[in-house]
Every structure is written in structure tokens, then in C-alpha cells.
């Protein structure tokens, strides 16, 4: 990635956090830092935990994984539930290892949980989630404690549904659980936090080219191999590109249409990521990329 000149000082052993939008070059930067300063690369991307997705999730290649240790990549079966809470429980023991953790990904909530703490909320029972999946957004909002609802983005169904599920399953409002948040496993002050500040047009061009690169690396074959087990409700099948290629494999759309839909979905996701990073990562070191 060749951004070494822009890096801040990286003290011996200090954990490094790397956040950035999809297709911005985070994995390349993590590998560069691991090779220059030492460390183990730890995944903080929700789609890259599944063993069935390498090309479609842009998981590091076997050749890249051979250049430095990688953890929490492709270690779960397709039907495993996964959330920020699952990730936090997996990553916390790794902070006490002998190797410097280089934690890299685009899932902003993971970094917030790591550096600010996260309430230990019980897992949502499947029947409660199934009920929530059937309810329209306004019904979900109506069933949430007003104090919790006041702090939510009411247009973000995933956040609204999560708040509804917690209250329905536990009988306790989400904001009360959050008030009991324990200390963070890794306070930001103990880390070297880096966020990639990307030029929008540069990123859009990379996104446009990325889908074809995924196809060249076998993304269509990956999705075809999972077609018989496809369940759009499972987190693994919500990875961008999977629903679009499934629709193509079912004969519903052309490959060109799948490419266009996936590119649009990726741009929309990148826009949400960039907004999150600007709003929530003001104390992180900015690394300009592209442009």
C-alpha cells in the first residue's frame, strides 16, 4: 500500500487498530505493518469470519496469510451466529498474547465495543428473532422503550430490531443494559488507531473493479457451492455480493445486473462506513489514501 511514510510512531508491542471503508486497502496496510513492525493480524470484519467465503468477502489470500499470522479469518461454519458480542469474546483473549495484535476491518461497531466497552446482553432466542423479522419498522419502534428509541437511528432497521429483540427477550430496555457496560478490553489510549481517509472517486473506481476481481478469484463458484443451503436470514448470506450472485444463479438476473447491484450495495455500505468513522473515530490517526 506504500503509506509507510504517513504512519505515526508505532511503539514496541503497542496494538494497532486499522479501520476503513470496504475496498480501501486495509488488509494490505495490516500486512505492511506486520512485516515491518511484527505482529499478528486479527480480523474485525463480519463477513470474513465464515469459512465458505474467501473471494466474495475479500479475505486475505493463502499467499498473504503465509506472510504473517492471521487470526479470526474463515474460522466459522456458514450457519454460525455472529455479532459484535461474539467477536469481542473471541478477540479479548488475543490481547494478552505475546505478539502485537494488528486488528483490521470495516465493522465500526467491533472497534467501538473493543475500545469503549460493550454491555453483556444475553443472546436473542431464535423465536424472538423470527418474530422480529416479520414486523414492520413502525411496529418495532412502537415496542421499544422511549429512552432507548430516542438514541436510535430510526431508519436503521438492524439497530431498531436489535433494541426490540433485547427488550422482548430480557424484559429490560437496551439503554439500561448499556448503562451497565463494563470497562473496555482495550482502551483507545493504549493503541495506535489508524483510519483510512479515502478519496470518494478513487474508492468508487476500486469498488467498480473489485467485483470482477472477486469473480476472477472464484466468487461465483463459492456462492454456487452454497446455493442449496442459502438462507437469507443467516448473517453469512448477507455478505454483499452473495444475494446478487444467488439471484443470478437462480436465473433471475444477468451477471451484469448482479455486478451492478453488488457495486451499488458496496458503495452504499462504504458511505455508511465513512459516516460512522467520521462521527465515531475523531481521536483516530487519519491516513489519506487515493486521490
UniProtKB/Swiss-Prot annotation:
Molecular function via GO: ATP binding; tRNA dimethylallyltransferase activity
Pfam families noted in UniProt: IPPT
SUPFAM superfamilies: P-loop containing nucleoside triphosphate hydrolases (SSF52540)
Annotated catalysed reactions: adenosine(37) in tRNA + dimethylallyl diphosphate = N(6)-dimethylallyladenosine(37) in tRNA + diphosphate
Domain of life: Bacteria
Site positions per UniProt: Interaction with substrate tRNA: 107, 129
Gene Ontology biological-process annotations: tRNA modification
Binding site for substrate: 22-27
Entry's EC annotation: 2.5.1.75
Top-level EC class as recorded in UniProt: transferase
Cofactor: Mg(2+)
Keyword ATP-binding listed: yes
Tagged with keyword Magnesium: yes
Keywords: ATP-binding, Magnesium, Nucleotide-binding, Transferase, tRNA processing
Binding site for ATP: 20-27
Disulfide bond positions: none
InterPro entries to which the protein is assigned, alphabetical: Dimethylallyltransferase, IPT, P-loop_NTPase
Quaternary state and interactors: Monomer.
Protein family: Belongs to the IPP transferase family.
Purpose of the protein: Catalyzes the transfer of a dimethylallyl group onto the adenine at position 37 in tRNAs that read codons beginning with uridine, leading to the formation of N6-(dimethylallyl)adenosine (i(6)A).
Protein name (Swiss-Prot/TrEMBL): tRNA dimethylallyltransferase
Protein species of origin: Ruegeria pomeroyi (strain ATCC 700808 / DSM 15171 / DSS-3) (Silicibacter pomeroyi)
Gene name of this polypeptide: miaA
Amino acid at each position: 500500500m506504500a503509506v509507510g511514510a504517513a504512519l505515526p510512531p508505532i511503539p514496541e508491542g503497542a496494538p494497532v487498530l486499522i479501520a476503513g471503508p470496504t475496498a480501501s486497502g486495509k488488509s494490505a496496510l495490516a500486512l505492511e505493518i506486520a512485516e515491518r513492525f511484527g505482529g499478528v493480524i486479527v480480523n474485525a470484519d463480519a463477513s470474513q469470519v465464515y469459512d465458505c467465503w474467501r473471494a466474495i468477502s475479500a479475505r486475505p489470500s493463502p499467499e498473504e496469510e503465509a506472510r504473517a499470522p492471521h487470526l479470526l479469518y474463515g474460522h466459522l461454519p456458514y450457519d454460525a451466529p455472529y455479532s459484535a458480542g461474539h467477536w469481542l469474546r473471541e478477540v479479548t483473549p488475543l490481547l494478552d498474547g505475546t505478539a502485537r495484535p494488528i486488528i483490521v476491518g470495516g465493522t465500526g461497531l467491533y472497534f467501538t465495543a473493543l475500545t469503549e466497552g460493550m454491555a453483556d446482553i444475553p443472546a436473542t432466542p431464535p423465536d424472538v428473532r423470527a418474530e422480529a423479522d416479520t414486523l414492520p419498522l413502525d411496529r418495532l419502534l412502537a415496542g421499544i422503550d422511549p429512552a432507548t428509541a430516542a438514541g436510535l437511528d430510526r431508519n436503521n432497521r438492524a439497530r431498531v430490531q436489535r433494541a426490540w429483540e433485547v427488550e422482548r427477550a430480557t424484559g429490560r430496555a437496551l439503554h439500561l443494559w448499556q448503562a451497565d457496560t463494563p470497562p473496555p478490553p482495550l482502551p483507545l489510549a493504549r493503541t495506535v488507531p489508524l483510519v483510512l481517509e479515502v478519496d470518494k472517486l478513487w474508492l468508487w473506481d476500486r469498488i467498480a473493479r473489485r467485483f470482477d476481481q472477486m469473480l476472477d478469484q472464484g466468487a461465483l463458484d463459492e456462492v454456487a457451492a452454497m446455493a442449496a443451503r442459502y438462507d437469507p436470514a443467516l448473517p453469512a448470506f448477507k455478505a454483499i455480493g452473495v444475494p446478487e450472485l444467488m439471484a443470478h444463479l437462480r436465473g433471475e438476473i444477468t451477471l451484469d445486473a448482479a455486478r451492478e447491484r453488488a457495486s451499488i450495495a458496496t458503495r452504499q455500505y462504504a458511505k455508511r462506513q465513512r459516516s460512522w468513522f467520521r462521527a465515531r473515530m475523531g481521536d483516530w490517526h487519519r491516513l489519506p489514501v487515493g486521490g
